[in-house]
């Protein structure tokens, strides 16, 4: 969308009414895909921050409720259908914690995700993030200096940082002890749920 199209969408009362109805209905229906579609539209259009935050909180609430059900069934999250959106919500919440310099909170959430996600590439990427979080590197510095912004990845990874400007496999090997120590410190988070 160009600036003119964004302005038209932002000022079109019918579209805004539709978007608000969709927001309300997606929350009532507990439809995480529709909730995210609405949230993404609201963010692009830079609409009411309070409604955006309310919708985001509903997404987190729904994701955590459903992830708990999945854990209680001893299942794992696959990066497809609504599971992809649950993973996105947990991940975005972890990144939000990191951006607020809550390194331990972000690390805990990413650790739980590593043990919950059924996807090797994402698990490795999350482990890389855990190692950087252990050094308390700020998110902006990490993003500017360690993320490969040019490399395209599979669409299902579009919500996650999986491309780095270094050999992540080698990095994981070189930092194996740090990761093992973090796992030891965080294992209580998953043992309690088993």
Question: For each of these PLM feature ranges, what is it?
Answer:
Residues 1-73, 132-194:
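N-terminal alpha-helical interaction modules that lie
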Residues 34-39, 86, 90, 127:
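TPR repeat positional signature
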Residues 52, 64-88, 93:
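Extended ligand-binding groove/face enriched in aromatic
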Residues 65, 119-120:
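Short coil loop/turn residues that delineate tetratricopeptide repeat
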Residues 78-85, 102-105, 122:
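Structural signature of alpha-solenoid helical repeat junctions
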């Amino acid at each position: 969308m160009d600036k003119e199209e964004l302005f038209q969408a932002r000022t079109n009362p019918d579209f805004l009414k539709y978007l608000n109805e969709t927001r309300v209905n997606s929350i009532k229906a507990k439809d995480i895909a529709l909730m995210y579609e609405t949230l993404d539209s609201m963010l692009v259009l830079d609409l009411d921050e309070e409604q955006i935050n309310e919708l985001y909180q509903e997404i987190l609430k729904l994701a955590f409720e459903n992830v708990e059900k999945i854990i209680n069934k001893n299942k794992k999250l696959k990066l497809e259908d609504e599971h992809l959106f649950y993973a996105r919500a947990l991940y975005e919440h972890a990144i939000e914690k990191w951006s607020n310099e809550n390194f331990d909170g972000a690390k805990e959430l990413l650790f739980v995700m590593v043990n919950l996600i059924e996807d090797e590439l994402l698990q490795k990427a999350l482990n890389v993030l855990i190692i950087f979080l252990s050094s308390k590197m700020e998110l902006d510095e990490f993003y500017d200096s360690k993320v490969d912004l040019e490399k395209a990845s599979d669409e299902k990874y579009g919500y996650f940082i999986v491309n780095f400007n270094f050999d992540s496999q080698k990095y994981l090997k070189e930092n194996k002890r740090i990761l093992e120590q973090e796992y030891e410190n965080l294992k209580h988070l998953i043992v309690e749920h088993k």
